[in-house]
Amino acid sequence: MRPAPALRMGEALLLKAPVQTMAKSLIEAIGYKLGWKAAQAKNAFDLMGGTDEESLRAEMRLGRDMAAALAERTPLVEENETTRFAVQIVRWLAAHVKEKKLPFSVLVTAEREPNALALPGGPIFVSWPLLEMCQGERDEIAFVIGHEIAHIVLRHTLDRIVKDAALSLLLRKSSGKLAASSWLNQAGRQVLSHAFSRDDEFDADTFAEALVRRAGGDPLAGESLLEKLAQLSAGHGMSIAGDYFATHPSLKERIANLRAKRPR
């Protein structure tokens, strides 16, 4: 395994700190700009209006509120060598993402199934079993995290969330964190866990591989991980990866996509 870049003292788990305050409520930061037409929107950025800077700030506030609400109801792994390693990898990859203003961060959850979740603006949740599947291989973990970074950068998650009519209604009535918490209790979890389109998933894989390459890692690590999981699944005669991989295209299709789009 290649050594990961050093992490400065005190930076280990920045996302562990709860989000206590926001500069403005989401109803000001996003709701006013959206005009509450989210259900009819074709694109999240068509809704936000204003400048790119204002849209980005609104996106980050939305993600922070959702991350805080989700962290309160999700079991988290206490800080240890693996969680610190995950944070190192996020910081390492973030340095090579072209969109520098997004504050990517990660929390490791104690869920029993492999799972990962990307929220608007930068927060990422990754489950302990999903990290274990990578067997400590930095570049395989980087591919998994890079895949989630792609959903953020390409606005896959944001488009889905902003178009949800239930969230827009809650944001009209409540401040950001309260609205996010209520939404997660209702339709939010289903919206977040619903499968992305095949094209979105293929694009996220391609993005992740390119990001690992740009960061100086092994660009074939993602394919190696997918092949390993495919072999394990075949050996068990069933999926060993739970719902997380079930919501993606098949492992064989993902491998074929990476090979087809890889620079010659």
Which ranges hold each PLM region?
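A Zn2+-metalloprotease active-site environment signal
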Residues: 2, 10-264
